[in-house]
Amino acid sequence: MARTPRIKSSGEGTAYYHLISRCSNRQFLFRKAASKDRLMDLAKRAAEFSGIKLLALTVMDNHFHILCSVTQSSEAVSREEIIRRVGVLKGDAAAQELRERWDNFAAAGFTAMLEAELCRYRARMNDISAFMKTMKELF
């Protein structure tokens, strides 16, 4: 049975969410403390990248709960802020690689390509679905 789609707030302001995710096939992936610690670290990094504030995080043996707040804003996330967030999520080398890529786009006059990539990153900001996807992909 498919899960019920998330009901997400639309518009500016702060919204609060209780997110739950279970392991597939009734596996107990988080039984070991190291796995729980790894998931908690990934959640913190993914939240920083996504612009989401973690309020509480509980990791059980086969599922986890996240309580978070998301503040929507009409202001777009700047290019430098996106690069900083990529560094938090994937490390300084990935952030530097992205900076060089975008600098090369700008130097070559490929502004449409640069803007398209910026739009893809901005679409992932302040979005709980993108946050959960990012976190699970990194685990």
Feature-to-residue mapping (PLM):
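Short catalytic/metal-binding and nucleic-acid-binding patches
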Residues: 1-139
